[in-house]
Swiss-Prot record:
The basic functional RuBisCO is composed of a large chain homodimer in a 'head-to-tail' conformation. In form I RuBisCO this homodimer is arranged in a barrel-like tetramer with the small subunits forming a tetrameric 'cap' on each end of the 'barrel'. Keywords: Calvin cycle, Carbon dioxide fixation, Disulfide bond, Lyase, Magnesium, Metal-binding, Monooxygenase, Oxidoreductase. The modification N6-carboxylysine is found at residue 204. Disulfide bonds: none annotated. A disulfide bond might be able to form between Cys-278 in the large chain dimeric partners within the hexadecamer. The record marks 336 as: Transition state stabilizer. Its cofactor is Mg(2+). It catalyses: 2 (2R)-3-phosphoglycerate + 2 H(+) = D-ribulose 1,5-bisphosphate + CO2 + H2O; D-ribulose 1,5-bisphosphate + O2 = 2-phosphoglycolate + (2R)-3-phosphoglycerate + 2 H(+). Belongs to the RuBisCO large chain family. Type I subfamily. This is Ribulose bisphosphate carboxylase large chain, chromosomal. Its EC number is 4.1.1.39. Heterohexadecamer of 8 large chains and 8 small chains. A disulfide link might be formed within the large subunit homodimers. The gene is cbbL1. Pfam families: RuBisCO_large, RuBisCO_large_N.
Length: 486
């Protein structure tokens, strides 16, 4: 009697019907060397218990490019080897054994030129709810020059904005009108006038002031521009106020933007929550009409703040620069809103660099050539006051808008005095810096000396002193200890 024959399972072929691991379908290639023309993405992933990190990385690559849950024969009708995204590197996250950094390369032909909506539909459209992964976060991206050149970028940029304002050698100053809701058009305009007359360069609508029963948008625009014109005449300076044109439809947003232009406004504003197609459309309108576009990052914290899941703001900032905003809120580090100092400085690099170099301490994982795209003016706003002027200039330099909302309008001597306090503090600090003084360490002394001759600044320092919202940041680099803002 013959011995029973051992039956061995036949190895699976790539296009055999059924379910196959993503890494076996070609979405993992540890030997892959990214091309200069690839779009690169870095994800922080937390695989489910028992899931191989390499398989999880391959799943991210697959689900953000061409894969579905089972083998499909129609892949063979495409240049599938080229169109498959490739996870090519997986690193453990320092001090966090459950998390991994996975690097994914995408062929440039996967993306429509000049469309952030298309880019995001692939990169973040599906993978964040994939069951084998507990959590995923998009930490950084690199775009090839060929892709960057399909975007027009900011219509104005830092240099042209300064030329239009005729203001050089210092940060710009602004304030958000408070309270953000409830004022009548006339009272709103009065707040704007007082702030600009006192020395600010800009006033600003807040994210949720649109057209409500207490103040129709047209009334606000009329009273605000009357205030801007009167303050400009009184001071001899070019002034502006960010008029929020955010509305329920693109048609209505265009209508409000046209009205702002007809009144002589130099700048309009939109909220991040309007979406990428709308942001790019408004950027195109601003380019055609010689207007500055301010972007308030309303809603970003819902997906940027948590370290293990969502999208890092450095990625949002890169998308916004491509999309063509001229201003964007990027954090203060010393204010009331989330922001690790080094991480926030990384956001400023994304806005202002001609070529952003890898800097792991700032959370920048890739070099990025911006291909002569104009630079974005970062905006520091949220819980800052005159007593922090030395910290703000030390952290962010000159090319930034420092917006003191409560730090202007909450001044005990009134709005105009609050604006004057901020302007005097700024000019005293810039002068001291230009004289070679160590403003970070000598800053409090410099402010006290300036306050001897400026009652509004003295009152501001007496009211807020050295108040800083120094909480432990939730979003920090995993490569270095968190720096202190003190």
């Amino acid at each position: 009697m013959n011995a029973p024959e051992t039956i061995q399972a036949k190895p699976r072929k790539r296009y055999d019907a059924g379910v196959m691991k993503y890494k076996e379908m070609g979405y993992w290639d540890g030997d892959y060397v990214p091309k200069d023309t690839d779009v690169l993405a870095l994800f922080r992933i937390t695989p489910q218990d028992g899931v191989d990190p390499v398989e999880a990385a391959a799943a991210v690559a697959g689900e953000s490019s061409t894969a579905t849950w089972t083998v499909v024969w129609t892949d063979r009708l495409t240049a599938c080897d080229m169109y498959r995204a490739k996870a090519y590197r997986v690193d453990p996250v320092p001090n966090n054994p459950e998390q991994f950094f996975c690097y994914v390369a995408y062929d440039l032909s996967l993306f429509e030129e000049g469309s952030i909506a298309n880019l995001t539909a692939s990169i973040i459209g599906n993978v964040f709810s994939f069951k084998p992964i507990k959590a995923a976060r998009l930490e950084d991206m690199r775009f090839p020059v060929a892709y960057v050149k399909t975007f027009a970028g900011p219509s104005t940029g830092i240099i042209v904005e300064r030329e239009r304002l005729d203001k050089f050698g210092r940060p710009l100053l602004g304030a958000t009108t408070k309270p953000k809701l409830g004022l009548s058009g006339r009272n709103y305009g009065r707040v704007v006038y007082e702030g600009l007359k006192g020395g600010l360069d800009f006033m600003k609508d807040d994210e949720n002031i649109n057209s409500q029963p207490f103040m129709h948008w047209r009334d606000r625009f009329l009273f605000v521009m009357d205030a801007v014109n009167k303050a400009s005449a009184a001071t001899g300076e070019v002034k502006g106020s960010y008029l929020n044109v955010t509305a329920g439809t693109m048609e209505e947003m265009y209508r409000r933007a046209e009205f702002a232009k007809s009144l002589g406004s130099v700048i309009i504003m939109v909220d991040l929550i309007v979406g990428w197609t709308c942001i790019q459309s408004m950027s195109n309108w601003c380019r055609q009409n010689d207007m500055i576009l301010h972007l308030h990052r309303a809603g970003h914290g819902t997906y940027t703040r948590q370290k293990n899941h969502g999208v890092s703001f450095r990625v949002i900032a890169k998308w916004l620069r491509l999309a063509g905003v001229d201003h964007m809120h990027t954090g203060t580090a010393v204010g009331k809103l989330e922001g690790d100092p080094l991480t926030v400085q990384g956001y400023y690099n994304v806005c202002r660099d001609a070529y952003t170099q890898t800097d792991l301490t700032r959370g920048l994982f890739f070099d990025q050539d911006w291909a002569s795209l104009r630079k974005v003016m970062p905006v520091a706003s949220g819980g800052i006051h005159a007593g922090q002027m030395h910290q703000l200039i030390h952290l962010f330099g000159d090319d930034v808008v420092l917006q003191f909302g409560g730090g202007t309008i909450g001044h005990p001597q009134g709005i105009q005095a609050g604006a004057t306090a901020n302007r005097v503090a700024l000019e005293a600090m810039v002068l001291a810096r230009n004289e070679g003084r160590d403003i970070l360490n000598e800053g409090p002394e410099i402010l006290r000396d300036a306050a001897r001759w400026c009652a509004p600044l003295r009152a501001a320092l007496d009211t807020w002193g050295d108040i800083t919202f120094n909480y432990t940041p939730t979003d920090t680099s995993d490569f270095v200890p968190t720096a202190s803002v003190a």
